[in-house]
Amino acid sequence: MARNGNPQFPDERSTATRAKATEPEELDDRFSDLEPEEDSPFLRSQKRVPVRRGPLPSKKAANRVKIALIVLGVLVVIGGVWMALSAYGEHSWRFRLESSDSIEVGGNEHMSRGEITRVFGGDISRNIFAVPLDERKKQVEELPWVESATVMRILPDRIRVQVTERKPVAFAQIGSRVQLIDAHGVLMEMPFSTTNKYSFPVISGMHENEPLSTRSARMKIYQELVKELDASGEHNSKSLSEVDVSDPDDVKVTVEDADGAVLVHLGSQNFADRFHLYVTHLKEWRSQYQHLDSVDLRYDRQVILNPDSHPSAAKPTAPAVAPAVEKPAVAKPAVAKPTAHTSGRRH
């Protein structure tokens, strides 16, 4: 037999043998340490791992969630019902505007019913929900006599129009025509039929093509004149047959009585005081002039009689009324008709 060339000593062999014998024992001891010793009274208890838990919803919060869900469900149901009703209303024949008889009109005293229903001519045989109420309202308010209007649907197949008409305050001479005019300068044709009998002065000095803003400014002058003349309660404005507002700096009024018509220049202020001066001295002036056509009261210290007449027909004013004696040719003439006004009668 071949021998190992490396010699082994007795101690080395015994050491190797003991090492092999102890290896399984050491492994067994290691695994045995992993097993819990249930019977050991000194066994340390295992540490519990903390578990984080969120707060549970309270009973009130749960009730709120339920209520919110119920409300949401009710809203969904209502929305569905509304959509169904809307679809039915938009397509059902029951909501059709059959004729102009289905249009109710109220508040029209000076306008005919047909003037208003003509605005809805294109809506006949249409569904009332397809009628643009706001647009029709604007169209109705564009009618001269209408100041404001309301348009509403009346289920199932009617429309109601309620109008508020303008209130005329005077007649306006526009070219060869005489129309009614309100406080804002809006011109209106004579009503087709009315039980009201108007007694207004005629306002001259307006033109058909001038903008509404210009007429509105002229009407403010007229209203201020009437307000001052009637402030004392004597209603002096009723004695006016014509008011010329063509010149804002010289408002001219025609006063007509049994002895004739007189054109009075009132200027742009102190209308009441100047008119009172005219009424107080009218008889005196007429006693001095056989034909008193006009009186100029624009100047504080003088009164000019017949300033619109020819100079040859003028005479000096009474010294008691006008200390500074003036003749019409000397005073600044005002633009007015040269003869007495008989055409501007109260209508």
UniProtKB/Swiss-Prot annotation:
Membrane protein topology class: Single-pass type II membrane protein
Coiled-coil spans in chain: none
Membrane side Cytoplasmic: residue ranges: 1-66
Pfam family, one: FtsQ_DivIB_C
Keyword presence, Glycoprotein: no
Family to which the UniProt record says this protein belongs: Belongs to the FtsQ/DivIB family. FtsQ subfamily.
Listed Basic and acidic residues bias regions: 10-33
Keywords: Cell cycle, Cell division, Cell inner membrane, Cell membrane, Membrane, Transmembrane, Transmembrane helix
Main location, first listed in the record: membrane
Function per UniProt: Essential cell division protein.
Residues in the Periplasmic compartment per record: 88-347
Subcellular location(s) per record: Cell inner membrane
Organism: Koribacter versatilis (strain Ellin345)
Domain POTRA: start-end pairs: 98-166
Ranges that cross the membrane: 67-87
Any one cellular-component term (Gene Ontology): plasma membrane
Name of this protein: Cell division protein FtsQ
UniProt feature, compositional bias: Low complexity: 313-340
Annotated Gene3D superfamilies: Cell division protein FtsQ/DivIB (3.40.50.11690), membrane protein fhac (3.10.20.310)
GO biological process: cell septum assembly; FtsZ-dependent cytokinesis
Region (Disordered) residue spans: 1-55, 308-347
